[in-house]
UniProtKB/Swiss-Prot annotation:
Specifically methylates the guanine in position 1207 of 16S rRNA in the 30S particle. GO terms for cellular component: cytoplasm. Its EC number is 2.1.1.172. One of its GO terms (molecular function) is nucleic acid binding. Keywords: Cytoplasm, Methyltransferase, rRNA processing, S-adenosyl-L-methionine, Transferase. It is found in: Cytoplasm. It catalyses: guanosine(1207) in 16S rRNA + S-adenosyl-L-methionine = N(2)-methylguanosine(1207) in 16S rRNA + S-adenosyl-L-homocysteine + H(+). Pfam families: MTS, MTS_N. Its main location: cytoplasm. It comes from Shewanella sp. (strain W3-18-1). Belongs to the methyltransferase superfamily. RsmC family. It comes from the Bacteria. The keyword Protein biosynthesis does not apply. This is Ribosomal RNA small subunit methyltransferase C.
């Protein structure tokens, strides 16, 4: 089953006949595979690890699948070139110029850019967002509540440098000052949000192997290692830009941790002495409530004897019931009018 934006691309796939195609920021469907009906080859770069896992079982000599903030093994002077680059307009609008610059770096001269997105997702502002080295974006299709724009690479794009897309700032935490590196598209208030502040203000003393689930830009990781530098910390997220941000944050603070993608806890191994998180489930939708349930269930199985589990969550979400059902007991060490802190120690 193809998503609505992917269906719009299929409606317009004739322009890809025998093209070497790159798909950026694709969704959790098999659109890149479907394009092989007309394209000579397709490379797909997912920025969401779940989307990558959905597609990668179908990889073959004509379909290469990647996860990350950029294509791997590229010569910065001569990156690999494509006849067409397809960009799925990102939900985080500040990420769009990054994706357009990345696309331009991988297009042949006068190569085709296709940008698709849902009407409600900000794509209507595409013409203003396209850099000057692209021709003016032309609307090619309007269907399935989506828009498809086309353009061509007319000029020369600046070389991709990750440092051009990072904002670095100092953050005061209960553990002291830390430097945060935030890439475009990664959530940041440039101050300590209320939930994380509640978590860090009541940080337990941990030991051994600790997991930071949904690490984002690495705020919790850096604060944790500042206070408890002896920890063997692992940081996981599903978002490529978040993982790259976390690595930059740790480096800026002279800290080390294992940073890697994981869909839930599926890519973690073994048991942990501690699991800490401000989990990214804040919208109360059924889908995210199910992800939250899976996180609680899976993390309960991966706690060592005497292991500590502590998360902060919006108080209106049904965490109390989920945690009580899984752990059999529930401690709330602190709360405010918006957030609750949940704590459990494995016996």
């Amino acid at each position: 089953m193809l998503t609505n934006p992917s269906q719009v691309i299929i409606r317009n796939q004739d322009s890809l006949n025998q093209h070497k195609v790159l798909v950026l920021n694709h969704e959790a469907d098999l659109l890149p595979k479907a394009l092989l009906d007309v394209a000579a080859s397709v490379d797909a770069l997912a920025l969401d690890y779940h989307h990558y896992l959905h597609l990668v079982p179908h990889a073959n000599s004509k379909l290469r699948c990647y996860f990350g903030h950029e294509l791997p093994h590229q010569d910065p002077i001569k990156p690999e070139k494509y006849d067409t680059v397809i960009v799925y307009f990102p939900k985080a609008k500040p990420l769009a110029p990054y994706l357009f610059t990345l696309a331009a770096n991988h297009l042949v001269p006068n190569g085709q850019l296709l940008v698709v997105g849902e009407n409600k997702g900000g794509i209507k502002s595409l013409v203003k967002l396209l850099p000057e080295y692209f021709a003016t974006g032309m609307k090619l299709d309007n269907a399935r509540h989506c828009l498809l724009f086309g353009s061509n690479l007319e000029g020369r794009a600046p070389a991709m440098k990750l440092s051009d897309w990072v904002s670095q700032y100092q953050l005061s935490t209960p553990q002291g000052e830390i430097s945060i590196c935030n890439l475009v598209g990664v959530f940041s208030e440039k101050r300590l949000d209320q939930g994380t502040e509640l978590l860090l203000s009541h940080l337990p003393t941990l030991s051994g192997r600790v997991l930071d689930f949904g690490c984002g830009a690495g705020v919790i990781a850096a604060a944790l290692l500042k206070a408890q530098p002896h920890l063997s910390l692992e940081c996981i997220d599903i978002n490529a830009m978040a993982l790259a941000s976390c690595e930059l944050t740790l480096a800026a603070n002279g800290m080390t941790a294992k940073v890697y993608p994981s869909d839930g806890l599926a890519q973690t191994t073994g048991k942990f002495n501690g699991i800490i998180s401000n989990p990214p489930f804040h919208d109360g939708l059924t889908s995210t409530t199910n992800i939250a349930k899976n996180f609680v269930t899976d993390s309960a199985k991966q706690l060592q004897h005497n292991g500590i589990w502590q998360i902060v969550a919006n108080r209106h979400l049904p965490y109390s019931d989920i945690i009580a059902a899984e752990f059999g007991q529930l401690t709330v060490p602190a709360e405010n009018n918006k957030y609750k802190l949940y704590y459990f120690q494995q016996q």
